[in-house]
């Protein structure tokens, strides 16, 4: 009876968290659509100008922020299980850097502006290559947590330096303006660019429903196989899905760090490690955090707009340092 009560209490906590996060997300969405240089009531815009600002600027960037935040948070939660590393995250491990590197190479290689689908495929390929490197090292070499983080940071620095050199030697103003975008920004996202969400949303929903399989994977590879799980196929499927989500996120909003690290880790600490609840709640919280960060980036400075990646890094970096100290990594 005591065990049943404990399980029931834990499920109640998860359900209450879903409810609270959903309410906060609705409030944040209304605030994000309303606030700016011109205050607009989303349900009753006054005039053609307010209508255009709402539908062509604020709504696309809000949808992009929600999708990117959800994708990065869910990807971070999956990576932490796949790598057996509570500090794994697409930005910290350099996966986002690989996506941005592939995207910049594509922009330099093509004589025309690539379509949103082509940019997503290029970013996905870069993310996939870096993910395979990290997964291969973590499984075959059995590197420690500290060394894996260092390898990821090194890969991120390497890709970042190549991107910086490329922009420095570029005479194209549009390419140089991309440097601001690569710092993380959903400003200027159009409805055409959001067409990639036709691929991203179904994949994200599928990923959020794989929590039970991840719970089995956390028991260990041998135990998971004994319970009928095809571990190798599932691992490859997760790698491809994470690469697609990270690649699409970078293609839409540039490199936005720490969302995939902070959200899953804090949820595990406060609510537990049941992935069937953790994955969808991480996605919701990730979307909420990035929508809130994007709203703050527009109002912190009166005459300028900060990249949303700067806001998330400001929030996430101190938490990351605290997590490193807490895990006693030498």
Swiss-Prot record:
The cross-references to InterPro entries, in alphabetical order and at most eight, read: ABC_BtuC-like, ABC_transptr_BtuC, ABC_transptr_permease_BtuC
> Could you tell me the keywords of this UniProt record?
Cell inner membrane, Cell membrane, Membrane, Transmembrane, Transmembrane helix, Transport
Q: Which superkingdom does the taxonomy of this entry point to? A: Bacteria
Cellular localisation: Cell inner membrane
Topology relative to the membrane, per the entry?
A: Multi-pass membrane protein
Looking at the Swiss-Prot or TrEMBL record, what is one Pfam family this protein matches?
A: FecCD
- What CDD domains does the annotation carry? TM_ABC_iron-siderophores_like
Keyword Cell membrane included in the entry's annotation: yes
Q: Name one GO molecular function term.
A: vitamin transmembrane transporter activity
Q: Does the keyword Nucleotidyltransferase apply?
A: no
A GO cellular component annotated for this chain's UniProt record is: plasma membrane
An example GO biological process term is: cobalamin transport
Membrane spanning stretches: 20-42, 62-84, 91-113, 117-136, 148-170, 190-209, 240-262, 277-299, 306-325
Q: Where is the signal peptide?
A: none
Coiled-coil intervals in this record?
none
Q: Which NCBIfam families match?
A: PRK03784.1
Q: How does it assemble?
A: The complex is composed of two ATP-binding proteins (BtuD), two transmembrane proteins (BtuC) and a solute-binding protein (BtuF).
Described purpose of this protein according to its UniProt entry:
Part of the ABC transporter complex BtuCDF involved in vitamin B12 import. Involved in the translocation of the substrate across the membrane.
Q: Which family does it belong to?
A: Belongs to the binding-protein-dependent transport system permease family. FecCD subfamily.
Entry protein name = Vitamin B12 import system permease protein BtuC
């Amino acid at each position: 009876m005591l065990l049943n009560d404990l399980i029931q209490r834990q499920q109640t906590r998860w359900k209450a968290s879903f409810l609270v996060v959903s309410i906060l997300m609705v409030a944040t969405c209304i605030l994000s659509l309303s606030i700016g240089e011109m205050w607009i009531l989303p349900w009753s815009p006054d005039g053609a100008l307010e209508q255009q600002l709402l539908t062509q600027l604020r709504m696309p960037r809000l949808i992009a922020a929600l999708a990117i935040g959800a994708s990065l948070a869910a990807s971070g939660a999956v990576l932490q299980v796949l790598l057996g590393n509570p500090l794994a995250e697409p930005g910290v491990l350099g996966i986002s850097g690989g996506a941005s590197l592939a995207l910049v190479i594509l922009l330099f290689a093509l004589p025309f502006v690539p379509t949103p689908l082509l940019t997503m495929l290029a970013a996905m390929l870069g993310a996939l290559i870096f993910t395979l490197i990290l997964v291969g090292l973590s499984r075959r070499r059995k590197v420690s947590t500290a060394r894996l983080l260092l390898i990821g940071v090194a890969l991120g620095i390497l890709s970042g330096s190549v991107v910086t050199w490329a922009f420095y030697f570029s005479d194209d103003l549009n390419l140089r303006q991309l440097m601001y975008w690569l710092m993380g920004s959903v400003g200027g996202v159009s409805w055409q660019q959001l067409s990639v969400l036709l691929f991203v949303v179904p994949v994200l929903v599928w990923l959020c429903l794989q929590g039970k399989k991840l719970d089995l994977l956390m028991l260990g590879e041998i135990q998971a196989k004994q319970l009928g799980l095809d571990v190798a196929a599932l691992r490859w499927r997760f790698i491809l899905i994470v690469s697609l989500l990270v690649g699409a996120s970078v293609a839409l909003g540039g490199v936005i760090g720490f969302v995939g690290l902070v959200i899953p880790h804090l949820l595990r600490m406060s609510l537990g490690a049941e992935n069937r609840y953790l994955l969808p709640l991480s996605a919701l919280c990730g979307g909420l955090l990035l929508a809130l960060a994007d709203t703050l980036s527009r109002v912190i400075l009166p005459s300028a707009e900060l990249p949303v990646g700067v806001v998330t890094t400001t929030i996430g970096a101190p938490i990351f340092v605290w997590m490193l100290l807490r895990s006693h990594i030498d």
